[in-house]
Amino acid sequence: MDIYPEIELSKAQHNAIEALRNKSFPAHQVTRSYYKQLPHMRVLNYEGDQLVGYMGLDYRVVRVGDEIYKVLGVSDFCVESTVQRQGIGTTMLSQLSEYASTKDVDFIILVSVLERFYLANGYQRLNSLSSWLRVHEHKNYGVAVEQLDDLYVKPIRGKTWAFGHIDWLGYMY
């Protein structure tokens, strides 16, 4: 597994990400290697020359109640269907946690419907009122305020996630 700054990706890497992403999220296919917004970094996991695991990463702050947290947000995490249930996703999450522990990150944060997978990998499920910039097809539609129940966080620096409204201070991953 390697982490690349977005700006350093090759055309071939973008093409491989687009193919895996679209195969993994058929209801959200697009003709680019990202869905809503370019992530700051890309995590690529290859077996030979085939991309078998991918996730986008965004580093920023969010506000929870009166607390400000530095978060590493995960977007579009996917593993090639032919190699799922072989530990690739779990290994990628473990390596991501190791990476984050060497950086100034309070929590890893993501949105997913895969509850058992993330709970088994040390994430906590949250149910909280959240606000974020609603973005679709390169256009913003204002600020959304909704209850989210498919949000997961993993503490990296021993902090406890505060109770309260989550302000994403931008778009949601």
Task: Enumerate the predicted regions with their spans.
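A conserved beta-strand-loop-helix scaffold within acyl/acetyltransferase catalytic domains
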Residues: 3-78
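Short alpha-helical functional segments enriched in proximate histidine and acidic residues
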Residues: 24, 99, 117
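Short loop segments at secondary-structure junctions
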Residues: 48-50, 82, 155-160
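Short acidic (Asp/Glu) patches
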Residues: 58-59, 92-96, 131-138
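Conserved acetyl-CoA-binding loop-helix of GNAT-fold acetyltransferases
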Residues: 79, 85-98
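Conserved active-site alpha-helix within GNAT-family acetyltransferase domains
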Residues: 102-106, 112-137
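C-terminal "cap" of GNAT-fold acetyltransferases
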Residues: 133-173
